[in-house]
């Protein structure tokens, strides 16, 4: 019986792994998710934490084998398709500080280029509910309106 070299077996295993589509790795597609986020502002001593809808998940992407200095690689990210803006009032702000903060709420998601107008396009950022000041929890059903203060 002919002996198969170890490098041939290794090559076959690598080819099998590369041939497996991304769906087999249980990568969540780009979808709407409910997420706890925080808002804070200089001059307001508390960080307001609440739940809202954001986009999260995996987008198919291609990485070229040959990278030319003249080619442009556009990576698609999971971002807002449609959205609306909501405004929330931060409590206990100093005199002269506008207590209103406006933020986007995702209505639909899509895989497209990242827009700095609505998204954090950094490679690695802080968690969405990160606070530098004292946390003031507000839950989805208790989110204050503009007129609660």
Curated annotation (Swiss-Prot):
InterPro entries to which the protein is assigned, alphabetical: Cystine-knot_cytokine, Glyco_hormone_CN, Gonadotropin_bsu, Gonadotropin_bsu_CS
Pfam family, one: Cys_knot
PANTHER family, per the entry: GLYCOPROTEIN HORMONE BETA CHAIN, LUTROPIN SUBUNIT BETA
Source taxonomy: Eukaryota, Metazoa, Chordata, Craniata, Vertebrata
Region forming the signal peptide: 1-24
Primary location recorded for the protein, binned into one broad class: secreted
GO molecular function: hormone activity
Cysteine pairs bridged by disulfides in the record: 30-78, 44-93, 47-131, 55-109, 59-111, 114-121
Keywords: Disulfide bond, Glycoprotein, Hormone, Secreted, Signal
Gene Ontology CC entries for this record: cytoplasm; extracellular space
Job of this protein: Involved in gametogenesis and steroidogenesis.
GO biological process: G protein-coupled receptor signaling pathway
Family stated for the protein in its record: Belongs to the glycoprotein hormones subunit beta family.
Subcellular location: Secreted
Glycan attachment positions: 34
Gene3D superfamilies: Cystine-knot cytokines
Spans traversing the lipid bilayer: none
Domain of life: Eukaryota
Protein known as: Gonadotropin subunit beta-2
Gene responsible for this protein: cgbb
Subunit structure of this chain's protein: Heterodimer of an alpha and a beta chain.
